[in-house]
C-alpha cells in the first residue's frame, strides 16, 4: 500500500510533520534534540514550515521515520487517470 501524500502548501508540510511525530509518540523536545534545534524552534517551525531549511527537513524526516520524495506531477496525474 502506497502511503505517499502530495504536498502543495507549506501548512500541509507542518501538519504532516506534526502528525508523524505524534504517531511515533515523540515529543517536540525529543525530535528537536535529534535535529539540532531547540524545542521552541521546532514548535515554531511546525506552525511556520515555510521557514524550514532543506537540511533541517531531511534530518527531521529521518528522525520521525519519513522519506522525502519528489516526483513529476504530470506523471502522477497520468497514473491516477489510468485507474
Set out the residue ranges of the language-model regions:
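Short alpha-helical DNA-recognition segment
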Residues: 25-43
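Short basic helix-loop element that most often maps to the first helix and adjoining turn
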Residues: 15-30, 59
